[in-house]
């Protein structure tokens, strides 16, 4: 989805988005219950848990990598169970989470200006992607404005469990509804 601004070779060499510190487990991708059964069949050793902070209203799940950490160091990273370090992501395209397809973009719920105001969603840029930091921000905004931003928000409206809370970390907004 972002191949016009991110080179697949850069992503394949980096794999930052496929490793998780304990403090970034909120970033692990979300799978539907329907996909979970297919994943368990294809990857019998992969472990899953209910997705946190989304109420599990849509029976959403993520992978459980807690047993991959070898130390108490909060900066230690554990890899996605579907990452082959030499081949990249091993998930079939139809099972690859939308979160992964749009990385380093995230859907955030913007803060309300008043209690009576409805929630508004926006597309934010995750600042930790080394490759996207080399791309001019306006180029990212232009891509989002070309239809990708609305496509992402439409998907989020149908899958609210993928929406993250707005924060200082996710404060670079690249798209909101016009």
Task: Put a short name on every predicted segment.
Residues 1-178:
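Short loop/turn segments that flank or connect secondary-structure elements
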């Amino acid at each position: 989805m972002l191949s016009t601004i991110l080179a697949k070779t850069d992503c394949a060499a980096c794999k930052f988005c496929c490793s998780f510190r304990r403090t970034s487990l909120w970033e692990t991708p979300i799978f539907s219950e329907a996909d979970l059964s297919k994943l368990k069949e294809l990857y019998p050793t992969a472990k899953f848990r209910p997705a946190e902070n989304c109420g599990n209203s849509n029976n959403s799940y993520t992978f459980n990598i807690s047993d991959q950490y070898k130390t108490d160091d909060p900066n230690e990273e554990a890899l996605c169970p579907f990452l082959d370090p030499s081949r990249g992501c091993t998930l079939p395209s139809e099972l690859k989470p939308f979160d992964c397809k749009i990385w380093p973009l995230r859907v955030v719920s913007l803060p309300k200006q008043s209690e009576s105001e409805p929630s508004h969603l926006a597309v934010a840029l995750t600042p930790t992607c080394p490759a996207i930091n080399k791309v001019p921000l306006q180029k990212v905004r232009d891509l989002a404005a070309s239809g990708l931003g609305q496509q992402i928000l439409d998907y989020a409206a149908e899958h609210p469990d993928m929406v993250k809370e707005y924060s200082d970390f996710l404060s670079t907004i690249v798209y909101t509804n016009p």
